[in-house]
Amino acid sequence: MSVRIAVLGAGNMGRGHGKRLEAAGARIVAVCDRSAAARQKFKEEMEETDIKEYWDFDEMLEKEAFEGLFICLPPFAQDGQFEKAAKRGKHIFIEKPIALDTETGKRMVKTAQENGIITRVGFHMRQGEAVKKLKQLIESGKTGRPVLFYGHYACNSLHTPWWIQVDLCGGQIFEQAIHLYDMCRYLIGEPKSVTGIMNNLCHGNTARYTVEDVSASVSLFGNGAAASITANNCEIPGIWKGSFKAVYEHVTVEFEDHNHAVFTYTDREQPETEEVSSEADAYEDEVREFLMCIENGKDTSCNITEGYKSLCFVEAVVESANMDGIKTAVKK
């Protein structure tokens, strides 16, 4: 039987996930969005012809029968929908960041655990083919101990009106660079402390632009490893870039992105290189994993607890930056 799905948020991300859901064999039964035009566009782009429309989330939750909910809302629009659905036993896929503060995130984790639901957070980079290969090497012990992580996120865009306002999106670290902070955790380990800086250097004359457009952090991990992650919104217009490098005792891996990387093995007399290149759709992979876990009753590889831990990481970066770079402990 096809997994029945409801989608909350009919924007670009919601429509993209909708198409991948249908490609994976799920049945979309309902879509909820405050915009009638967005709901209509969502329905027009789906193959399913009997998708119910809702303006009110509570009404959709009350009237529709579905197993899984996709929450594809901007950070500011998330207002307890996760907890309401969890208490009804709905399995939930939620985009990052899961919340704008860790206290809310902690409540979400608690509610999910108390109600035994399956969750998945949209950190799609974990599903990249090059990332998967490195993770396998880590788990086999072939990389040796982790040493250092470098990450760089760059773009130059005003995106959408809500994105440029820090009270609505949390800032670039929260809304975009969090992908690299999550990747750092995934490949290196859990951070102990961080020192962060951030500023707005390129958009001082842009109306309502209150998010940082440049940031940098240095982190220390429980296993002794370190990380340096930078982000900015001042580089090349039309190009979004998230590159990173992971250094281990026996291998160094340079990632152009999550699907493309060069592995240099240093545990031999002459270093050897191996290139991994793939055009696989990491978004599709995370959607399929979520559906499979619902069908099999198993937890996903990136559940709400993982989303909370990465939220704690970026919150500590911002807290440090707001205190002029004072070393700040990362919550557990």
Model-derived segments and their meaning:
Residues 105-124, 144-151:
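Rossmann-fold dehydrogenase core element
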Residues 175, 182-260, 287-298:
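Contiguous beta-strand/loop segments that form the cofactor/metal-binding neighborhood of enzyme cores
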Residues 1-48:
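N-terminal Rossmann-like dinucleotide-binding module
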